[in-house]
């Protein structure tokens, strides 16, 4: 009997508490700390808040801290973009100073490179002209060191006198390529071509016919009217 009376009292108490209770939805943002005393609300609100809302509160706090910094970040970015040319110029100045220090440290090697720089550029563009220009400096060197310049000029290494003779005839050969008539009328060129004549008689004959050859180049009609040439031909 006592057990029945106890159960009846329990049911009455539960019904009374259910009628007077305040219900908060699980996803509601109403703080539970509002039911606490004012001096405890600030300390306990973060603990008593719904755990589902805690990540959302953290995101709001992070966004609130970032948004005021956004204009400052944009200003700093624009300032950095404006300073990029200055940074590039500073890097160029540093590089130039490094090159100057390198030149001062090895001035002899730098001067040698500057002397050969035009020849190297010409060699990459026109190898034939480059090889022709390479012959000119080595013709002035002593013939006692032919093996050192073998890759540059094999003729100078094998036969130095013939190479030097060709270097002396180089201006006249260029004249022959530009103007054959002017080249043949040069009387001072005849001693250079003595090696072409097979014997002394032929050389003397060429020397005698040299004035007539010049006349044939300047005026062929008058050249064929010469009696000496006519007698020699007929």
Curated annotation (Swiss-Prot):
Q: Is Repeat found in the keyword set?
A: yes
Q: Which UniProt keywords apply?
A: Repeat, Seed storage protein, Signal, Storage protein
* Repeat in keyword set: yes
Signal peptide range: 1-21
Annotated Gene Ontology MF terms? nutrient reservoir activity
Cross-referenced InterPro entries: Zein (IPR002530), Zein-alpha (IPR051903)
Known role: Zeins are major seed storage proteins.
Which family is this protein grouped under? Belongs to the zein family.
The miscellaneous comment for this protein is:
The alpha zeins of 19 kDa and 22 kDa account for 70% of the total zein fraction. They are encoded by a large multigene family.
Specify the protein name: Zein-alpha 19B1
What taxonomic lineage is listed for the species of origin? Eukaryota, Viridiplantae, Streptophyta, Embryophyta, Tracheophyta
């Amino acid at each position: 009997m006592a057990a029945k009376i106890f159960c009846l009292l329990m049911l009455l108490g539960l019904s009374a508490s259910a009628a007077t209770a305040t219900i908060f939805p699980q996803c509601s943002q109403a703080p539970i700390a509002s039911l606490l005393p004012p001096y405890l609300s600030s300390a306990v609100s973060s603990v008593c808040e719904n755990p589902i809302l805690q990540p959302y509160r953290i995101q709001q706090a992070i966004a609130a801290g970032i948004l005021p910094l956004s204009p400052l970040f944009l200003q700093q970015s624009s300032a950095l973009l404006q300073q990029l040319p200055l940074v590039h110029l500073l890097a160029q100045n540093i590089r130039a100073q490094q090159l100057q220090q390198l030149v001062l440290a090895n001035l002899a090697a730098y001067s040698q490179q500057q002397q050969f720089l035009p020849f190297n550029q010409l060699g990459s563009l026109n190898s034939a002209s480059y090889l022709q220009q390479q012959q000119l400096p080595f013709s002035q060197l002593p013939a006692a060191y032919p093996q050192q310049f073998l890759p540059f000029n094999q003729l100078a290494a094998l036969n130095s006198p013939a190479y030097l003779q060709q270097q002396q005839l180089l201006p006249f050969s260029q004249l022959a390529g530009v103007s054959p008539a002017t080249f043949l009328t040069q009387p001072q060129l005849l001693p250079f071509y003595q090696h072409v004549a097979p014997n002394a008689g032929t050389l003397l004959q060429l020397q005698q016919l040299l004035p007539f050859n010049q006349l044939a180049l300047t005026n062929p009609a008058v050249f064929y009217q010469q009696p000496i040439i006519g007698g020699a031909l007929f």
